[in-house]
Amino acid sequence: MKFQLPTSKVFSTLFLFQFSFRGGFMFDNSRYITKGINEELPLNLQILLWSLVDTLLVEKDYLQIFNIKVIRGNLLEITHSQEKSPYKRTIQAVGNIDRDMKVYIIDSQEYSTMLFAE
């Protein structure tokens, strides 16, 4: 099933306004992960990071930043931030990782990619 937008001038103007000024459909495209993410970041944490971006209520920046710190054992502290439309939120989660990590999710308009900052 293919979705087609209405072609009226009023709708086009409103659509452009929403897309330009409200973040519109940023991160609403194909999603990819790098080999490093696939090998080192457990699937449950990958899904959590994507969902944090999906549920963000402020205007989204093309670059989403996640600092993941091991508190003890499998207890993690995840700080999600962005620079444009400043945003910062810290949560705790459970996951099995061996080291602290910095993860980016970048939207290039055609697709979104999750990758390590290093």
Please name every model-derived segment.
Residues 83-118:
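Short, compact, well-ordered microdomains
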Residues 2-93:
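N-terminal "domain-start" segment
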